[in-house]
Regions:
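Transmembrane alpha-helix interface/packing and boundary motifs in multi-pass membrane proteins
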Residues: 60-74, 184-187, 246-254
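Hydrophobic mid-bilayer segments of alpha-helices in multi-pass membrane transport proteins
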Residues: 80, 105-107, 136, 140, ...
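Early transmembrane hairpin of solute transport permeases
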Residues: 20-169
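Membrane-embedded helical hairpins/re-entrant loop segments and their flanking transmembrane helices
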Residues: 11, 40-56, 245-271
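N-terminal membrane topogenic signal
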Residues: 10-23
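Flexible hinge motifs at transmembrane-helix junctions and intramembrane kinks/re-entrant loops
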Residues: 181-223, 248-252
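Short, Lys/Arg-rich, polar N-terminal cytosolic tail immediately upstream
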Residues: 1-13
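Helix-loop-helix junctions that connect adjacent transmembrane segments
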Residues: 156-173, 208-249
């Protein structure tokens, strides 16, 4: 039955290969479940609620992609660029509440869905040069890298130059640099789940050396605190138009750039 639906033989694969690929993809994406709540909690979101929402949304999106796309599925999860914009730009920078930000995300998502189901999607994507599609993803990656460097302590705020070199003697910076380098080495060696392995390994080192705090294996009961907790009225106000447009812009072009990159690597451009 699965072979008939997913066409394993036609695509020269089998159930075992797909299971291994699925586990490898999970290990590659698992860090998002931890990083997304960390970033959004800086903007006032509840860590437990975001963790639960991230896990549920990712699972649902992957199931839909698997059964709808069939032979061309991709792993779907919250974007690591758009969450940083919400936390640091919308909530901290513009002083919106998490509920108002969630309302803006909902409206932007509805607009994204409408555009995706109409010819507008193809027109917009085909109008963008391939170099720009790839460049958008790279730009968002650099934005995230800058945030990561600041959290590590490698960079710091400067009132004149905006960014300056941090304290290189900070032990937390050395731990962060070690984790980053280890992830790159594992990536080059083709080790699956390099990001989550690096996070776990250096978290343990931080706990042992006293620079981290271990709160147990099981934290708290999954929280559904953000289920339908969006402020739609605020999201539809005139003051939120730029926020909604920016969220849609980031989401649409980040998706276009990512899918273009994945399709280019897998040889499925134009399919």
């Amino acid at each position: 039955m699965l072979d008939n639906y997913f066409k394993y033989k036609q695509h020269k694969t089998d159930f075992k290969t797909e299971v291994v690929a699925g586990v490898s993809t999970f290990l590659t994406m698992a860090y998002i479940m931890f990083l997304n709540p960390v970033i959004l909690s800086d903007g006032g979101f509840d860590f437990g609620g975001v963790f639960t929402a991230t896990a549920c949304a990712t699972a649902l999106a992957c199931f839909i992609a698997a059964f709808y796309a069939k032979t061309w599925p991709v792993g779907l999860a919250p974007g690591m660029g758009i969450n940083a914009f919400i936390a640091y730009g919308v909530c901290l920078g513009m002083n919106y509440t998490p509920e108002e930000a969630l309302g803006a995300v909902l409206v932007a998502g509805v607009v994204f869905l409408i555009v995706s189901l109409t010819p507008i999607r193809a027109w917009l994507i085909n109008s963008i040069p391939k170099s720009l599609k790839l460049g958008i993803g790279a730009g968002i990656g650099l934005f995230l890298a800058l945030i990561g460097f600041e959290i590590m302590g490698l960079t710091a705020d400067n009132p004149v130059t905006l960014v300056q070199l941090g304290d290189l003697s900070n032990p937390l910076l050395l731990l962060g640099a070690g984790a980053f380098i280890s992830m790159i080495v594992m990536e080059k060696k083709g080790i699956k789940g390099n990001i989550i392995i690096g996070i776990i390994a250096f978290s343990i080192i931080a706990w042992i050396t006293g620079y981290g705090q271990f709160n147990g294996v099981v934290g708290e009961v999954p929280s559904m605190s953000y289920l339908f907790k969006f402020d739609l009225g605020a999201a539809l106000s005139a003051s939120m138009v730029t926020v909604v447009f920016t969220l849609f812009f980031i989401d649409f072009f980040d998706t276009a750039g990512t899918l273009t990159s994945v399709a280019n690597v897998s040889g499925k451009i134009g399919r």
